[in-house]
Structures are given as structure tokens and as C-alpha cells.
From Swiss-Prot:
Lineage: Eukaryota, Fungi, Dikarya, Ascomycota, Saccharomycotina
Protein name, UniProt field: Translation machinery-associated protein 17
Quaternary structure, from the entry: Interacts with RPT6. Interacts with the 40S and 60S ribosomal subunits.
Gene behind the chain: TMA17
PTM-bearing positions, type Phosphoserine: 24, 68
Compartments (UniProt record): Cytoplasm; Nucleus
Protein's organism: Saccharomyces cerevisiae (strain ATCC 204508 / S288c)
Length: 150
């Protein structure tokens, strides 16, 4: 069985769409659950980091009971690290959301059975692009085959 945890390298969204098209419905559901769990963890992490940032910037003096100890032990030198972490987490969240959308599109496509999945349509559109050029070489002058006549 395949899982998001088994991926050894970052995978681009197009590769992800291709990979999920060959998976079972159960695998799609499992991967979606794993991604949604990761999204929840990142959102909680960003909320906590947001509190740290607000505390360091002096914008938030309100402390919740469970956060007061953690917020008292933060160092002002950590501000840049916290901001970078939030920014990186947002990028990962966007990537995860793209994957959830792709999983939902694949599921809808499988349930409706109508037409082609969005990924298949996009892939076909990319292969059909290009200039319409006459590739027929039957009119080539044998004496000067590499010449261009204007």
C-alpha cells in the first residue's frame, strides 16, 4: 500500500496527479486523511508561532493559561526564525491544499465517470500545443535538400 509518509522526495503536483490516478479509492482516502492531518498540525503550529511573534513584537499581551509558560521562555532572537517558519509552513499548506483538491477532483471523476479528469484534459492540451507545420518532405529538392527557398 502506498502512503504519503512513504514518499522519499518532494513530488510536484503534476506527478502527484499522475500517481493518484493509478491508486485505489481506499488509498486516495488514506492519503487525503494523512494530508488533512498534516494540515491541521501545521495550522496549529502557525497559530502557536503567531502568538510567539505577537508577544515578541509587543502586539499581544493576552496569555492563555496553557501558553503562558511557553511564551515566557521565548527569546527576542527567535523572531526571525518564527517568521521564517510561518512563511515556510504557509508554502507547505498551499501545496497540501493543492493535493487535497487533486484528490477530490480524482474522486469526483471516478464517481461521475463523465468525460475526463482535469489532469487528463490538461495533459492532452499540453501534447497538442505547437505550431501547425507541414512536415511533409515529398517536395524536397534532391540537389539542395537543406536549402530554404523564399
Amino acid at each position: 500500500m502506498c502512503s504519503a509518509g512513504g514518499i522519499r522526495r518532494p513530488i510536484q503536483i503534476e506527478e502527484f496527479k499522475t500517481a493518484i490516478s493509478g491508486m485505489s479509492d481506499m488509498e486516495l482516502a488514506q492519503i487525503k486523511t494523512e494530508i488533512e492531518n498534516s494540515i491541521n498540525h501545521l495550522q496549529r503550529s502557525n497559530a502557536r508561532l503567531g502568538k510567539y511573534i505577537a508577544k515578541l513584537e509587543g502586539a499581544d499581551d493576552r496569555l492563555e493559561a496553557d501558553d503562558s509558560d511557553d511564551l515566557e521562555n521565548i527569546d527576542s532572537g527567535d523572531l526571525a526564525l518564527y517568521k521564517d517558519s510561518v512563511r515556510e509552513n504557509e508554502i507547505v499548506l498551499n501545496n497540501y491544499n493543492e493535493r487535497v483538491d487533486a484528490l477530490e477532483q480524482e474522486t469526483v471523476y471516478r464517481k461521475t465517470g463523465h468525460g475526463k479528469s482535469k489532469h487528463e484534459v490538461e495533459a492532452k492540451d499540453n501534447t497538442n500545443k505547437g505550431p501547425d507545420v507541414d512536415m511533409d518532405n515529398s517536395n524536397v529538392d534532391v540537389v539542395t535538400p537543406n536549402s530554404i527557398f523564399i
